[in-house]
């Protein structure tokens, strides 16, 4: 949308036209004027100004003014960026104007021409909508009896204006004639002030100067300053032209000197550097098209003086060409068993990724020219995604480079800047290839889901070429401007979530999902990796400290509750520091860290099972939720009070979750008699559903069965079993539909000490991905209808509930055999 602003710059090539002053009498100016805010310009009486308008308030103003043939007030804004200016945003002095021409340029854009008539002062704003109106006082020029001084000031003004015009050859000769033709001194001062290139504040000061003599003196100061600036500018311009002539002469002499040195066989340091560069280019193994470009640039470099800035630009470019690994490839370690041992040594679990790397090495062993895979590891923080890249590089015998993409918002970070820009460099991918020194490194693209985008472009769109196996063999960097082959690179991207990654970019990567660890896995990771690492970092040895299995269990259950192991490593580091203090103080005997010693060092337990406490009253149910950091418990609290049938929802809920609550209430009303609830329970009762942790946004359909269970518990007075958690979408007919994130939710239930988990029947297949420990220690109840849910979840099933739970208490549900591509339903 266009703004109300003057067409052209403040100092245009032709002085703004001025109409004769005194076109309106003071008595003819209304006491209340519609106000048109003006940006980046000051409008003077007698001036004729073209304007482009687009703000809705201004469009309404000009339509009314044209229809009623009334004058308007034009007032300059103090800050041009203000979209809806008020009294504080406008200057107090403006110009009465008449609209002399109006053209519609588009649907919401108009062009008009206004003529300045007289000055006015704003007394107060009396209207803000549909546009501004103000009560005003007309202002006339204050003239003194000293006409001789005013006449002298006018002569000086014209003289100074002629000098300024002569210093600006781009102005037409008519500019001088226009200035000479004006006889009215106030009109002359306003004309010059309107056209001289000075800040808006200084122009406004001229407009607000009512005393004619003071105004003319002020304009004289502005003109005099402008004249001095123009003189200095012309002087600098002449000096630059002279310097250019001098540079051209020096270049000619240098070329002659170079020819003389060649004849005498006296090559200088510059020539030796160029010969060395040429030799490096020959050894770089450049492709034919790149070699052609490099030789052309090298020949041009030989003709440029070393002191020239262009010499540095060309030399830097050729250095980049020579240093890139165009043909250097590191040999893959194709020993499958060695790679398996290396991966198992560095990382516990994550079998999917290890399996995929071993598959790649096996195929690479059979087919030598295979392209590098493009993997994307998706999972919560702390599960080992980033560190896995280094392990993959060790296992394959390749170089490792890492690119952190989190917060990158500039497309030039990926493709580089063109060489025309000062300080231009290649993008991060080319820089990383130079750092790796080989054509086939393992390149870790860390936090690819946290790429940004702004006015400088979208980096995720630039990555489409990099991560496309059909295109990245001719990747084009803006700085190099020649194709570079990235097809041999093994890309390993990491992300916490898939949703922020654009669909086309996600489609180019092979997604491998990593989930959280069980307690047993965390203890194994701590014993094998974390404890030895922290002992080494704190200068300790196994002779100083022995952390028992009991202590590790306490750490994983009472002091950390996360999908990964970062906080677990921090707590182990806390214990090591406490022991280090004692060892440094002279204590020599070996210290055994058990559960009591952990509590002594770390203080009170941070986590404990609160499910039983939360669900000890009717109306509270335990649900399961998926988050970017893994799964988590989601408590739902319901209460009732006297009212008129309303339902309040709190906890920062999204639209889908609100609709789930509405559907659950409708289902309960339709089944009230069957469940032993009064059919008219809403007539004198209000319901309130609350989802604790109100600062965290929540959404999704998977809380449907939990909401319905909590409401049923509240209205029947039957408590929900405290050892039971559930997830699933409930329909208006009571059917239970499948949801996603089952593995993460089940692991969250296991971490929290839940014993029974209610799942949709169609999610039975998703338990294949759940670790054996969690699967063996939990009882799974598969349901297809809400009757099954209520019978399994409530301590005493309500009267009239039909159906049976989908599983048998005390038995693990039978699991399907793994399939190559089993469909997975996600909420």
From Swiss-Prot:
Which GO CC annotations does the UniProt entry carry? Answer: cytoplasm
- Residues of the region (Disordered) are 1-22, 799-827
Q: What domain of life?
A: Bacteria
Assembly: Homohexamer. Organized in a ring with a central cavity.
Organism lineage reads as: Bacteria, Pseudomonadati, Myxococcota, Myxococcia, Myxococcales
Q: What is this protein's function per UniProt?
A: ATP-dependent serine protease that mediates the selective degradation of mutant and abnormal proteins as well as certain short-lived regulatory proteins. Required for cellular homeostasis and for survival from DNA damage and developmental changes induced by stress. Degrades polypeptides processively to yield small peptide fragments that are 5 to 10 amino acids long. Binds to DNA in a double-stranded, site-specific manner.
Instruction: Please give the InterPro entries that the UniProt record associates with this protein.
Output: AAA+_ATPase (IPR003593), ATPase_AAA_core (IPR003959), Lon_bac (IPR027543), Lon_bac/euk-typ (IPR004815), Lon_lid (IPR054594), Lon_proteolytic (IPR008269), Lon_Prtase (IPR027065), Lon_prtase_N (IPR003111)
Q: Does the UniProt entry include the keyword Protein transport?
A: no
Residue ranges occupied by any Lon N-terminal domain in the UniProt entry? 33-227
State the species of origin: Myxococcus xanthus
Catalytic EC class? hydrolase
Q: Which UniProt keywords apply?
A: ATP-binding, Cytoplasm, Hydrolase, Nucleotide-binding, Protease, Serine protease, Stress response
Residue stretches making up the Lon proteolytic domain: 615-796
> Where in or outside the cell?
Cytoplasm
ATP-binding recorded as keyword:
yes
Family statement drawn from the similarity comment of this UniProt entry: Belongs to the peptidase S16 family.
Known PANTHER family for this protein? ATP DEPENDENT LON PROTEASE FAMILY MEMBER
Which catalytic residues are annotated?
Answer: 702, 745
Q: What is this protein called?
A: Lon protease 2
Q: Which GO terms describe its molecular function?
A: ATP binding; ATP hydrolysis activity; ATP-dependent peptidase activity; sequence-specific DNA binding; serine-type endopeptidase activity
Name the residues that bind ATP.
379-386
**What GO terms in the biological process aspect are recorded for it?**
cellular response to heat; protein quality control for misfolded or incompletely synthesized proteins
């Amino acid at each position: 949308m266009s703004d109300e602003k003057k067409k052209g710059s403040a100092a245009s090539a032709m002085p703004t036209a001025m109409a004769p002053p005194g076109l309106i009498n003071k008595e003819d100016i209304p006491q209340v004027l519609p106000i048109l805010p003006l940006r980046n310009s000051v409008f003077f009486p007698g001036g004729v100004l073209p304007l482009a308008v687009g703000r809705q308030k201004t469009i309404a103003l000009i339509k009314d003014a044209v229809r009623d043939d009334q004058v308007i007030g034009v007032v300059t804004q103090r800050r041009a960026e203000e979209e809806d200016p008020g009294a504080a945003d406008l200057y107090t002095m403006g110009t009465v104007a008449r609209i002399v021409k109006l053209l519609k340029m588009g649907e919401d854009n108009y062009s008009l021409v206004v003529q300045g008539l007289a000055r006015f002062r704003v007394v107060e704003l009396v209207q803000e909508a549909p546009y501004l109106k103000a009560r005003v006082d007309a202002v006339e020029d204050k003239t003194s009896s000293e006409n001789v001084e005013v006449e002298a000031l006018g002569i000086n003004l014209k003289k100074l204006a002629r000098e300024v015009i002569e210093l600006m050859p781009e102005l037409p000769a008519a500019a001088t004639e226009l200035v000479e033709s004006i006889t009215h001194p106030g009109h002359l001062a306003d004309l010059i002030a309107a056209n001289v290139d000075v800040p808006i504040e200084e122009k406004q000061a001229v407009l607000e100067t009512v005393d004619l003599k003071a105004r003319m003196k002020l304009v004289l100061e502005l003109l005099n300053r402008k004249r001095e600036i123009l003189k200095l500018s012309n002087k600098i311009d002449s000096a630059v032209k002279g310097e250019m002539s001098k540079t051209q002469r020096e270049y000619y002499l240098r070329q002659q000197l170079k020819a003389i040195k060649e004849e005498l066989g006296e090559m200088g340091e510059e020539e030796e550097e160029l010969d060395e560069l040429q030799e490096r280019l020959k050894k770089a193994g450049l492709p034919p098209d790149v070699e052609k470009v490099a030789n052309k640039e090298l020949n041009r470099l030989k003709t440029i003086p070393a002191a020239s800035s262009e010499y540095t630009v060309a030399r830097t470019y050729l250095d980049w060409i020579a240093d890139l690994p165009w043909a250097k490839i590191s040999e893959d370690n194709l020993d499958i068993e060695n790679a398996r041992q290396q991966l198992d040594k560095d990382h516990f679990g994550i079998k999917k990724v290890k399996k995929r790397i071993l598959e790649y090495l096996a195929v690479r062993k059979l087919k030598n020219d295979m392209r590098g895979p493009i993997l994307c590891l998706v999972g919560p923080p702390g599960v080992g995604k980033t560190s896995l890249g280094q392990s993959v590089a060790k296992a394959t015998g390749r170089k490792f480079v890492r690119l952190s993409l989190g917060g990158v918002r500039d497309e030039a970070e990926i493709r580089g800047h063109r060489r025309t820009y000062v300080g231009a460099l290649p993008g991060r991918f080319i820089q990383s290839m130079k750092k790796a020194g080989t054509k086939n490194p393992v390149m870790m693209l860390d936090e690819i889901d946290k790429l940004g985008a702004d006015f400088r472009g979208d980096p995720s769109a630039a990555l489409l070429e990099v991560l496309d196996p059909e295109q990245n063999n001719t990747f084009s960097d803006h700085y190099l401007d020649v194709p570079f082959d990235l097809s041999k690179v093994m890309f390993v991207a990491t992300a916490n979530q898939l949703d922020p990654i654009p669909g086309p970019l996600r489609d180019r990567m092979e997604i491998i999902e990593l989930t959280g660890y069980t307690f047993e896995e965390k203890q194994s990771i701590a014993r094998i990796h974390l404890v030895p690492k922290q002992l080494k970092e704190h200068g300790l040895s196994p002779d100083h400290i022995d952390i028992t299995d009991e202590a590790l269990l306490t750490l994983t259950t009472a002091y950390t509750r996360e999908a990964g192991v970062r906080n677990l490593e921090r707590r182990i580091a806390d214990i090591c520091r406490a022991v280090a203090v004692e060892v440094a103080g002279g204590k020599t005997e070996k210290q055994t860290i058990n559960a009591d010693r952990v509590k002594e060092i770390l203080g009170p337990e941070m986590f404990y099972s609160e499910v039983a406490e939360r669900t000890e009253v009717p109306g509270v149910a335990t649900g399961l939720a998926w988050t970017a950091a893994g799964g988590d418990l989601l408590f739902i609290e319901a209460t009732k009070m006297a009212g008129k049938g309303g339902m309040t929802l709190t906890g920062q809920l999204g639209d889908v979750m609100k609709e789930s609550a509405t559907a659950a209430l409708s289902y309960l009303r339709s089944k009230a008699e069957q469940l032993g609830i009064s059919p008219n329970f809403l007539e004198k009762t209000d319901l309130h559903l609350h989802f604790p942790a109100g600062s965290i946004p929540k959404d999704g359909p998977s809380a449907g069965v939990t909401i319905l269970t909590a409401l049923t518990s509240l209205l029947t007075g039957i408590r929900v079993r405290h050892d039971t958690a559930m997830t699933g979408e409930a329909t208006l007919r009571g059917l239970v539909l499948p949801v996603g994130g089952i593995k993460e939710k089940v692991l969250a239930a296991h971490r929290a000490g839940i014993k029974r988990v209610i799942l949709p029947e169609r999610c039975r297949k998703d338990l294949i991905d759940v670790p054996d420990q969690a699967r063996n220690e939990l009882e799974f109840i598969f349901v297809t209808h809400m009757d099954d849910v209520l019978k399994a979840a409530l301590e005493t099933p309500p009267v009239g509930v039909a159906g049976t739970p989908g599983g048998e208490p005390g038995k693990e549900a039978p699991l399907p055999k793994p399939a190559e591509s089993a469909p997975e339903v996600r909420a």
